[in-house]
């Protein structure tokens, strides 16, 4: 019984190693790239969650959308002030992997973003463990407010935003 288990385990490990040698993990595939990412976000002194989608346009450019929610500790009120902690944005990134001939598992990018609350710039990096799964870290700075009502609390403008999370591609 123990010998059969050991043989099966060795077979599974051998197959996994062979398959992993055939697969090439790439952090950015260009026009064929589609990614969903989810992560922890820290903006100013507040924490939150971000969820986004990114699609490659060519070997150097990608576009995407992103939604952020900050945990302010405020309760929903009648005036709708809790909506001040939400943001949605569009971003366009330039990927430096081809330019600097980085390993295919690693991607460094810079870009611009325009959202419901702010306009800004950002940069980030991704590392992929496999063809579909990886991690990312990003930083953004948004010096310009867009649609803010008078009396609204401004959480996003002028605050550094840092985020880390998981990315899933197909």
Feature-to-residue mapping (PLM):
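Bacterial Sec-dependent N-terminal signal peptides
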Residues: 1-30
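Short glycine/proline- and aromatic-enriched beta-strand/turn motifs that initiate or cap beta-hairpins
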Residues: 21-63, 90, 94, 167-170
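Flexible, solvent-exposed loop segments that connect beta-strands
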Residues: 27-34, 65-86, 106, 145-156
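Transmembrane beta-strands of outer-membrane beta-barrel proteins
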Residues: 34-38, 63-65, 106-112, 135-137, ...
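Solvent-exposed loop/turn segments connecting transmembrane beta-strands
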Residues: 38-50, 75-84, 111-122, 151-159
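Residues on the lipid-exposed face of transmembrane beta-strands in outer-membrane beta-barrel proteins
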Residues: 40, 51-55, 88-98, 112, ...
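Repeated loop/turn-to-beta-strand initiation elements of outer-membrane beta-barrel proteins
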Residues: 59-65, 99-103, 129-135
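Predominantly the C-terminal beta-signal and adjacent terminal strand-loop region
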Residues: 70-78, 127-170
